[in-house]
């Protein structure tokens, strides 16, 4: 056994096991993982947003669940899957966070509901 073999062996035997990797972006698994995080976020912020907005956000999450549960979800084009993933991980949380930062502004509640209604239409079309 050469000098480099011993060091390589020692290094590999003491290395920690690899952490499970995150789902591949745009995969059905990534949509599911994003939706889990979204639901946790919604539970945490539920008392801070108007009831109508909360209902719309939960409806969007349900549409995402419907997509994930559909066995043909893997057949969606990658662009659609990435859009759905981003809806759960970015679009919806960012919309709610923007509302939370500006909720004292006039018409903030109505604007939030309007934005979430637009996202809900897109999510319902994807789930159909």
Language model segments and positions:
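Polybasic, Ser/Thr-rich amphipathic helices
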Residues: 1-12
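A generic structural micro-environment signature
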Residues: 7, 55, 90-93
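Membrane-proximal, non-transmembrane interface segments of integral membrane proteins
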Residues: 14-75, 86
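Cytosol-/stroma-facing membrane-proximal "stalk/adaptor" domains immediately downstream
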Residues: 78-128
